[in-house]
Amino acid sequence: ALVRGEDSYVWDAEGNRYLDLFPGWGCGLLGHCPGPVVEAVREQLGLLIHVPNTWHTELQGRWAEALSTRSFGGQAFFCNSGTEANEAAIKLVRLHSTPKRRYKIITFEGSFHGRTLGSTTATAQPKYHEGLGPLMAGFVYAPFGDLDAVARLIGEDTAAIMIEPIQGEGGVRIPPDGFLAGLRKLADEND
């Protein structure tokens, strides 16, 4: 069993050192116990450990402003995980689009959006769907990088296009040049 880690190395209970070649998930890609992260966590532990999202904190406000000014602008919603962020995105899309009778969300083959039912349904990989019974309705899948296929899937009932800009499930898949801009254009043309 592993008992500690530092940078790219981990140690087991017997003191054996191993080079950790696993890329990790989003929260683990900085290595094991990187100094600046450890110090920031120590500092935060002396201030606030956890508050529910019904409370506002100064740091949250600063992060929300930084995210909003560097992205699409508007509001920010903080979550505990990528799955929770994707579930919130699905709900917000449905909430906004239901009055327009839109519900369909286009996702991409090879994607991974999480392990809850909605996020698993958004994940366009049959191996994650096996044994789950009926999945959440309203998801359709397009080949990653194929703008023409996406355009064919868009209809009056389409509410959103959901994409990992760079896919990481089973390797790193970078979209072809112009693909993300093309998706933005398709979305804008179809409200």
List each language-model region with its residue ranges:
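Glycine-rich loop-to-alpha-helix module at the N-terminal edge of alpha/beta enzyme cores
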Residues: 17-106
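Conserved PLP-binding active-site segment in aminotransferase class I/II-type PLP enzymes
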Residues: 1-6, 26, 43, 186-190
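Active-site and channel-lining beta-strand-loop segments
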Residues: 1-20
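PLP-dependent aminotransferase-class I/II
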Residues: 5, 110-167, 171-185, 189
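Conserved beta-strand and immediately adjacent loop positions that scaffold enzyme active sites
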Residues: 7-9, 75, 104, 138
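Generic structural signal for well-ordered, non-membrane alpha-helical segments
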Residues: 3, 7, 34, 56-60, ...
